[in-house]
């Protein structure tokens, strides 16, 4: 991964943890596997205490990191700890994949 992009991803993760009070921020997808291309987005799985509706959470995170993106597309998915646990118990293959292969930030 390009060192500048890697540094930017780390800063994005730090900001989300600090300002969105995220318990976990996990990089997944092509940037995590090393298969990213110029058309790839930065896939982030976020666990945070929030009462926002599902799609509002993503909008909030995008606004929060707007100045750090520098033109890079970011695709956040935000769940609460309770939602995550429910999906883990249901053996959701998406969640299992993110947790097994994602990179914690």
Q: How would you describe each model-predicted region?
A:
Residues 1-24, 33-38, 48-105:
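Catalytic core of pol beta-like nucleotidyltransferases
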Residues 30:
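Conserved H-loop
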Residues 43-47:
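Short beta-strand->loop micro-motif that forms the acidic, two-metal-ion catalytic signature
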């Amino acid at each position: 991964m390009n060192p500048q992009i890697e540094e930017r991803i780390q800063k994005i993760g730090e900001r989300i943890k600090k300002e969105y009070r995220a318990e976990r921020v996990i990089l997944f997808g092509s940037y995590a596997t090393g298969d990213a291309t110029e058309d790839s987005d930065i896939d982030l799985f976020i666990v945070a205490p929030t009462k926002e509706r599902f799609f509002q959470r993503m909008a909030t995170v995008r606004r929060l990191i707007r100045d750090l993106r520098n033109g890079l597309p970011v695709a956040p998915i935000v769940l609460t700890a309770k939602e995550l646990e429910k999906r883990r118990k249901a053996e959701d293959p998406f969640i299992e994949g993110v947790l097994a292969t994602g990179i914690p930030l």
